[in-house]
Each structure stands twice: as C-alpha cells, then as structure tokens.
Amino acid sequence: MKILIAGFKGDDNSAKILLDHIKKICNEDILYLENDFEISSKQIEEKLLENYDNVLIFGQKPNTTNIYFENNAILEGKKLVTDYYYGALKENLEQYAYQVMNSYDAGKYLCNNVFFRALNFKQENNLKSKIAFIHIPTIDNIEDMNHLLSSIKDYIENLYEEEK
C-alpha cells in the first residue's frame, strides 16, 4: 500500500498544519502544494507518476466546522468524478464526532484546479490511484487539531489493515 497525502502551503492553512502533524507520526509521503495553479498542477502530476494506491489531498474551507468530501472537479466546462470510496473515511470521522458532508463543488480556485488536474492526469495516463479531495475547516474552526489528526491516522492504519 502506497499513500500520498497532499495539502496546500501556508502558515495559517489548516491543511498545511494537518500535514505537518501527519508528517511527525506517519511514514506516508507528504506533498506540500504551492499556492499557484501551474506549479501545484505540475507537483501533483509528478507525484502521481509514482503509482500511489491512495491519494488524499486536503484543502481548507472557510466558514464551516464540517468536513467536505469532494466528489468531482469542474474546469472549463469539463466535469471529472472521483472513484474514491469515502465510506470508510466518513465512518471514521463520524466516530470522532465530525460532521461530514458530500460536496459536488470543489470551488473555483486552487482546490478545484489541483483536484481536476489530478483526476485528469490519472485518466489520461490510465493510473490506478484512488484520488480524494477533503476540505477541512480553517484553523480557527477546528476545535482540536490533534483530534482530527487521530481520526486521519486511524483511517490510514485501517487502509493498511484492509490490504492484509
């Protein structure tokens, strides 16, 4: 099992802060995405060539305490849908008392762009990676980052258990 965990840079970006924490306790590959359309697209495409089984991309969503699973990305009128199965992750997060929502709008900015580029690159190169995009609240709307970290860590451990 090979897992990539990605998120956008930024000292106050909750995705970056979550990745910093994950990096300390897990051995997964971590990718800090630049806050730039072209650079982040190239970064994710280069990493996808390493044939990950699962790719978890995190972004932050303002004005909410909920966690959102993005099911598709739309760019220039083209819609791409992920084949990532969110069910086990949803159950895991709900066990930690998080409200989890399915979303069909990854936004109009960097999150949607990198998700679209990843899905498109997967499709064009016939890759097997399962790609997820997860929007988490901004840092001021996360009550306890360690609690969120524990839920993500448990989920990753479960992925490895399922593989056995």
Question: What does each of the following model-derived ranges do?
Answer:
Residues 1-108, 118-131, 146-163:
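N-terminal catalytic or cofactor-binding beta/alpha core of small enzyme domains
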